[in-house]
C-alpha cells in the first residue's frame, strides 16, 4: 500500500520536561520519527517545551515550537500551521493525554486535523481501565478482578469483597503516578484519595493483588494490512508489585516455557486487534502465577513507551521509526530492516545474546528534606521512582547482569560491610535489593530462603549464586591459562574485582591478562542472530574467541557518553555528545560512541559510525581504545562520568582531545583554582579547604558564618549545604559527610547572602573566547544553579558587572588552556563580581543557550577539540546577545516522593527543564512556568505562609488577588517548609517557595493579563538573532 499522499504536514507532540516516568526515551523516539517522516517527504511540525532535547533542534523538524504543552498553545499552533494530521503516540503519556483533550474538546475537528497512528477510540480503550477490562473479557482473556471507582467509598466496598492487599491504578497518569498497594483500609483511603485527585478524569482501578507473580512484557507492532509482529519479550526480574520502570528487566524472557510464551504471543496479537491499534507499536504487560501458571493481562500502552526504547536498543529494531511510517500508510513488508538491508521489517527480530536493564534512583536527594510521613522510605511500589537506567549486553544473563551493575557506577560489593541481620531487612523491593541478595548468597543463605523473601524466580537466584561461587573459588584458584581467564571474564568479573579477590592491583591483573592474549572480542547486534550480514555497526564485548568487528584505517574519534541519567547529569549531556558526533562526522572523522543508556539518541544505531554499548569504566573504555586505535578521546561533553575517567585514560597513554586534563584538574582542585584567581586578580568569596571534620570545625570561624559546605569533586550539588553556625556544621559533618564512601576534602566557602548568581557558558579555541550566554538566576545564591529558573540575557545586572563577567571569563578560559566549552558561575553584589567555580566541560545549560542564541555550541566545541579555531568555524560575534528573552524553569518530581515537603537548596533535585521565549522577559518566564507544569493563576485567591511577607502580600492585593488563610486557594506562597506545600503538590496546585520566585511570578502574571497568547517557531526567533 503506498503511503498516504493526502497528508502533507504532520504535527508531533513531544513529551515535555524530563521527569520520573517520562525521560529521554521520548526524545529518542521523537527524533527517530521526525527523521523518518521527513525522509518520506512529509513536512513535520514539532511542539515540545523541553530545550534539552535533540528533537527540538531547529534543523530537525521544518517548524519547531518550544511552547507550553497545553490546549491554548496547541490550538494557537494548529491555527498558525494548519497541519493535516497529528501523530500522538510519540510524546509519552503527556502527548497522548493532550491529543485526547484536543479531540474531546473538538479542537482537532475545528481545524480539520486527523489523528493518525492511534484513533481516539483505541487510545480510550487502551488507557481507560474499565474499557480495557471489558475488551479483555470480550476476547476471553483473564484480567485481575477489578473495579473502576470514582470515590473512596466505592473502593473500600470492592476491597472488602476481594480481600487485601489491593492495587490502585489511577486512569491516564504517567509512570503509575498516584498509584500504589494498599494492605489495609487505612492505606487504601490514603492511596486512593491521592490517586483520584491525580487522575485527570478522577477515576482509578482498584484490583485484586497479584503481588509476587512473575511479570512479562511483549513489544508488539501492527500495520494496516493486519500484520502483527512481536519485537521481543521482556521479563521483570523483580516480581509484580514493582513498577516495570523500577524493575531489573531482561530480554528475551528467560523463565517462560515455550508453551507459555506461545500463549502470551497469541494473547498479545488478539489484544492489539481488539483494542484497535491500527498501526504502530504497543507494550502489553502480563502476570503469571509461578505456582499454577495462570496468566492474566495487566495493562497495555497503545503508544511508544519506555519499554519500546529498551526493546529497540535490545534488538536493533527501530520501533519509533517504523511506527511513524506505519502511521502514514506503509506496510511492515514494504519497510527494509536498516541493519541487514536484506530482510523486511515484518521479520521478527531474533537475538543470540542477553540484555539486562537496571534502573538508577535518587532517593538520597530527597531523604534529608522534611516529610509529613516521617522518613522517606526507599520502598519500590507500583508508582515509578527511578530517574534513569543502564543497559548491558552479554552472551549470558550472568555476564549482562554484571556489566549492567558496573554501568551503574557503584561498587558491586557496596553492602559488604553490612551486618547479616541488616541485609536480611533489605530484601523488600528497594534499590539495594540486588546487592543484598548477592551479599547474602556470599554468606551462604539458601536460594529457597531468598526466594521466599523476595519472590525473585529461583532461576535468577541460581545464576547469581553461580557468580558468587566462582568468586569464592577464584580466591584459592588463580587463573592459570587462557581458558581460566576467559571463564572468569565471561562471568562479567572486572579486572578490579579479580584483583580484590586475589589481593592484587587492577593494573597488575590487566597486565597478566593481556600477557596471555586474553582480550575481549566484539560482537554485533544484528536483529537476526547472525543469519544475515549486518551493515549497522552496533557492538558489545564478550570473552569468546571470534571477533566480529574489524576496525577501519580511517582517522577516528571516540566520544564518551554520560551513562544512566541521574539528577545532576541529565539528557543535556547526551545532547552535547550527539552534537559532537554529528559535527565530527561532517568533518570526515569516523565517530565511535561509547555509552550504556538505552533511552538516548546517542545510543541509536545510526547516530555514530560505530556504537559500543558498554559500561563507562576505565577497563571497558581502554579495551575499546586498544581495539579501535583512535586519534583521541573526547571526555569533556558527557558530564562527570567520562570526566572521572580522564586521568586514568591519560595515564594509560590515551590522547584526550580538547581541554587538557591539567586544566580540568586545576579548575576542580580548590587550592590550585584559588591560586589561579589570585594571580589573575579575580575576586572569590573567602574560602578554605579542610582535609578532615576536625580541621573543618577549626577553620570555619576564620572564614565566618554563614558557610556553604560541600565535598570536593561532586556534580549536582551532592551533599552541599548552607550552615549558619557551628551546631549546624557539626550536624552536617556527622549526618551528610561521614556516610560518604570516598571521604573527600571539605570545601568551606563564605556564603554571599542576597547575591544574584550568574551562569556563563563560553567557548574557547585557545586564542579567542566566545562568551555565548550569560544567564541570570531568579532564585538567589544558596539555591543550586541546576534548580534555579534562569533568564538570558540578564535583566537585573548592571552593565558594569556584565563587562567584568565577560573579562573574567575570557581570562580564565585562556589561562586554563580551555579548548572547547567552559562554564563559570558568578555571584554579583551590586557591581562587585565574585567567581564561584569554573568547569572546563559541557554544562547542563549548553542546549538551552544553543537554542536561545541559535548557535550549536557542542558541535563547535567538538571541532575545536580536533584543531579548528573559532575564526575557521565562521564565528564572528564573540558576545552574542539575542534581541529577545529566553527563560528556563526546572521540574522537580515532588509528587513521586510521598510526604516530602518541597524546599529549594544547594543540593540539586530537578530532573528536567522547560523553556519560554518572548520579547518580554516576564512573559518568557511565564511561558517557562507553564511549560514546567506550574499554571500560575491570572486571578483568584493566594495563601501566604511565613514571616515578613507584608510587602509581597501588598503587591498581590494591589494586583487584584484575594488573600486567604484557608485550604481553598489558587496559589500558595510559603517561604518555610510547611506541610501545606505537600498538600499543594498532591492537589496539583501551583506553589512558590522563594521571595524572588513570588516577585517574578507576579510580574509574569501582570504581563500575561495584558498581552494574551503568542506562539512563534524557534526558526522565526532565530531569524531575529544576530548571526555569530
Swiss-Prot record:
Keyword Magnesium attributed: yes
UniProtKB keywords: Amino-acid biosynthesis, Arginine biosynthesis, ATP-binding, Ligase, Magnesium, Manganese, Metal-binding, Nucleotide-binding, Pyrimidine biosynthesis, Repeat
Binding residue positions for Mn(2+) 2: 299, 301
Cofactor(s) in the UniProt record: Mg(2+); Mn(2+)
Protein residues bound to Mn(2+) 1: 285, 299
Region of interest: Carbamoyl phosphate synthetic domain: 550-933
A Gene Ontology cellular-component term: cytoplasm
Positions contributing to ATP 2 binding: 710, 750, 752, 757, 782-785, 825, 837
Domain called MGS-like: residue spans: 934-1028
Upper taxonomic lineage: Bacteria, Thermotogati, Deinococcota, Deinococci, Thermales
Binding site for Mn(2+) 3: 825, 837
UniProt cofactor note: Binds 4 Mg(2+) or Mn(2+) ions per subunit.
EC number(s) reported in the record: 6.3.4.16, 6.3.5.5
Keyword Amino-acid biosynthesis: yes
HAMAP family: CPSase_L_chain_B
Protein name: Carbamoyl phosphate synthase large chain
Biological role: Large subunit of the glutamine-dependent carbamoyl phosphate synthetase (CPSase). CPSase catalyzes the formation of carbamoyl phosphate from the ammonia moiety of glutamine, carbonate, and phosphate donated by ATP, constituting the first step of 2 biosynthetic pathways, one leading to arginine and/or urea and the other to pyrimidine nucleotides.
Amino acid at each position: 500500500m503506498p503511503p498516504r499522499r493526502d497528508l502533507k504536514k504532520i504535527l508531533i507532540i513531544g513529551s515535555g520536561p524530563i521527569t520520573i516516568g517520562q525521560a529521554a526515551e521520548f526524545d529518542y523516539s521523537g527524533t527517530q520519527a521526525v527523521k523518518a517522516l521527513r525522509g518520506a517527504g512529509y513536512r513535520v511540525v514539532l511542539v515540545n517545551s523541553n530545550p534539552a532535547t535533540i528533537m527540538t533542534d531547529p534543523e530537525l523538524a521544518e517548524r519547531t515550537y518550544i511552547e507550553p504543552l497545553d490546549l491554548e498553545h496547541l490550538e494557537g499552533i494548529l491555527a498558525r500551521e494548519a497541519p493535516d494530521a497529528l501523530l500522538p503516540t510519540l510524546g509519552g503519556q503527556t502527548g497522548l493525554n493532550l491529543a485526547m483533550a484536543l479531540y474531546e474538546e473538538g479542537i482537532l475537528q475545528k481545524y480539520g486535523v486527523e489523528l493518525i497512528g492511534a484513533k481516539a477510540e483505541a487510545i480510550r480503550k487502551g488507557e481507560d481501565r474499565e474499557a480495557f477490562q471489558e475488551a479483555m473479557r470480550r476476547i476471553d482473556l483473564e484480567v485481575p478482578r477489578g473495579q473502576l471507582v470514582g470515590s473512596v467509598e466505592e473502593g473500600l466496598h470492592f476491597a472488602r469483597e476481594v480481600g487485601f492487599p489491593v492495587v490502585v491504578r489511577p486512569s491516564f497518569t504517567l509512570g503509575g503516578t498516584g498509584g500504589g498497594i494498599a494492605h489495609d483500609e487505612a492505606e487504601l483511603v490514603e492511596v486512593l484519595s491521592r490517586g483520584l485527585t491525580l487522575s485527570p478524569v478522577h477515576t482509578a482501578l482498584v484490583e485484586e493483588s497479584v503481588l509476587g507473580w512473575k511479570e512479562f512484557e511483549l513489544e508488539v507492532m501492527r500495520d494496516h494490512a493486519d500484520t502483527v509482529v512481536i519485537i521481543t519479550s521482556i521479563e521483570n526480574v523483580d516480581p509484580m508489585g514493582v513498577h516495570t520502570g523500577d524493575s531489573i528487566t531482561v530480554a528475551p524472557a528467560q523463565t517462560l516455557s515455550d508453551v507459555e510464551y506461545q500463549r502470551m504471543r497469541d494473547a498479545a496479537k488478539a489484544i492489539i486487534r481488539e483494542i484497535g491499534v491500527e498501526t504502530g507499536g504497543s507494550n502489553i504487560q502480563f502476570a503469571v502465577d509461578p505456582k499454577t501458571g495462570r496468566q492474566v493481562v495487566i495493562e497495555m500502552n497503545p503508544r511508544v513507551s519506555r519499554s519500546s526504547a529498551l526493546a529497540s536498543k535490545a534488538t536493533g529494531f527501530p520501533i519509533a521509526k517504523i511506527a511513524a511510517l506505519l502511521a502514514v500508510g506503509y506496510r511492515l513488508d514494504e519497510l527494509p530492516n536498516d541493519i541487514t538491508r536484506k530482510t523486511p521489517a515484518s521479520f521478527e527480530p531474533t537475538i543470540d545474546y542477553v540484555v539486562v536493564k537496571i534502573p538508577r534512583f535518587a532517593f538520597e536527594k530527597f531523604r534529608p528534606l522534611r516529610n509529613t510521613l516521617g522518613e522517606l522510605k526507599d520502598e519500590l511500589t507500583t508508582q515509578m521512582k527511578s530517574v534513569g537506567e543502564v543497559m548491558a549486553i552479554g552472551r549470558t544473563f550472568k555476564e549482562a547482569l554484571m556489566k549492567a551493575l558496573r554501568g551503574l557506577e557503584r561498587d558491586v560489593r557496596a553492602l559488604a560491610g553490612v551486618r547479616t541481620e541488616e541485609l536480611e531487612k533489605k530484601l523488600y523491593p528497594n534499590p539495594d535489593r540486588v546487592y543484598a541478595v548477592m551479599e547474602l548468597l556470599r554468606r551462604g543463605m539458601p536460594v529457597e530462603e531468598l526466594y521466599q523473601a523476595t519472590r525473585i524466580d529461583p532461576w535468577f537466584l541460581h545464576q547469581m549464586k553461580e557468580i558468587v561461587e566462582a568468586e569464592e573459588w577464584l580466591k584459592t584458584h588463580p587463573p592459570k591459562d587462557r581458558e581460566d581467564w576467559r571463564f572468569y571474564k565471561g562471568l562479567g568479573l572486572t579486572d578490579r574485582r579479580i584483583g580484590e579477590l586475589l589481593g592484587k592491583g587492577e593494573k597488575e591483573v590487566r597486565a597478566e591478562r593481556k600477557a596471555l592474549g586474553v582480550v575481549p572480542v566484539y560482537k554485533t547486534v544484528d536483529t537476526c542472530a547472525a543469519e544475515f550480514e549486518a551493515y549497522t555497526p552496533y557492538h558489545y564485548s564478550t570473552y569468546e574467541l571470534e571477533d566480529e568487528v574489524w576496525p577501519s584505517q580511517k582517522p577516528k574519534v571516540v566520544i564518551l557518553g554520560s551513562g544512566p541519567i541521574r539528577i545532576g547529569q541529565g539528557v543535556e549531556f547526551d545532547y552535547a555528545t550527539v552534537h559532537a558526533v554529528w559535527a565530527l562526522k561532517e568533518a570526515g572523522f569516523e565517530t565511535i560512541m561509547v555509552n550504556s543508556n538505552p533511552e538516548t539518541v546517542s545510543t541509536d544505531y545510526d547516530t555514530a559510525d560505530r556504537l559500543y554499548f558498554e559500561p563507562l569504566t576505565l577497563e571497558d573504555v581502554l579495551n575499546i581504545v586498544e581495539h579501535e586505535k583512535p586519534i583521541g578521546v573526547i571526555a569533556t561533553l558527557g558530564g562527570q562520568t567520562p570526566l572521572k575517567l580522564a586521568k586514568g585514560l591519560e595515564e594509560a597513554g590515551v590522547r584526550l582531545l580538547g581541554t587538557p586534563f591539567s586544566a580540568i584538574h586545576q579548575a576542580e582542585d580548590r587550592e590550585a583554582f584559588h591560586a589561579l584567581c589570585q594571580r589573575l586578580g579575580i575576586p572569590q568569596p573567602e574560602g578554605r579547604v579542610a582535609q578532615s571534620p576536625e580541621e573543618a570545625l577549626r577553620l570555619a570561624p576564620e572564614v565566618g558564618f554563614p558557610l556553604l559546605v560541600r565535598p570536593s569533586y561532586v556534580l549536582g550539588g551532592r551533599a552541599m549545604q548552607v550552615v549558619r553556625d557551628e551546631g549546624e556544621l557539626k550536624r552536617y559533618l556527622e549526618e551528610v559527610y561521614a556516610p560518604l564512601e570516598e571521604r573527600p576534602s571539605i570545601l568551606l566557602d563564605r556564603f554571599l547572602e542576597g547575591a544574584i548568581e550568574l551562569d556563563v557558558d563560553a567557548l574557547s579555541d585557545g586564542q579567542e573566547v566566545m562568551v555565548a550566554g550569560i544567564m541570570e538566576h531568579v532564585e538567589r545564591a544558596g539555591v543550586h544553579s541546576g534548580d534555579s529558573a534562569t533568564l538570558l540575557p540578564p535583566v537585573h545586572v548592571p552593565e558594569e558587572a556584565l563587562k567584568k563577567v565577560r573579562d573574567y571569563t575570557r581570562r580564565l578560559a585562556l589561562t586554563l588552556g580551555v579548548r572547547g566549552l567552559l562554564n563559570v558561575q558568578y555571584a554579583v553584589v551590586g557591581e562587585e563580581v565574585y567567581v564561584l567555580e569554573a568547569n572546563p566541560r559541557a554544562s547542563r545549560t549548553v542546549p538551552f543557550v544553543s537554542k536561545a542564541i541559535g548557535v550549536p555550541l557542542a558541535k563547535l566545541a567538538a571541532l575545536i577539540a580536533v584543531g579548528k579555531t573559532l575564526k575557521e568555524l565562521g564565528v564572528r560575534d564573540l558576545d552574542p546577545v539575542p534581541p529577545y528573552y529566553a527563560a528556563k524553569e526546572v521540574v522537580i518530581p515532588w509528587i513521586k516522593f510521598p510526604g516530602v515537603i518541597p524546599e529549594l537548596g544547594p543540593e540539586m533535585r530537578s530532573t528536567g527543564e522547560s523553556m519560554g521565549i518572548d520579547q518580554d522577559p516576564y512573559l518568557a518566564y511565564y511561558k517557562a512556568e507553564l511549560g514546567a507544569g506550574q499554571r500560575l493563576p491570572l486571578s483568584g485567591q493566594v495563601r501566604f505562609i511565613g514571616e515578613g511577607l507584608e510587602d509581597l502580600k501588598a503587591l498581590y492585593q494591589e494586583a487584584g488577588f484575594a488573600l486567604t488563610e484557608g485550604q481553598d486557594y489558587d496559589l500558595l506562597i510559603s517561604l518555610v517548609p510547611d506541610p501545606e506545600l505537600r498538600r499543594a503538590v498532591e492537589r496539583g496546585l501551583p506553589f512558590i517557595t522563594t521571595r524572588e520566585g513570588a516577585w517574578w511570578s507576579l510580574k509574569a502574571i501582570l504581563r500575561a493579563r495584558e498581552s494574551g497568547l503568542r506562539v512563534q517557531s524557534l526558526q522565526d526567533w532565530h531569524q531575529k538573532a544576530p548571526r555569530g
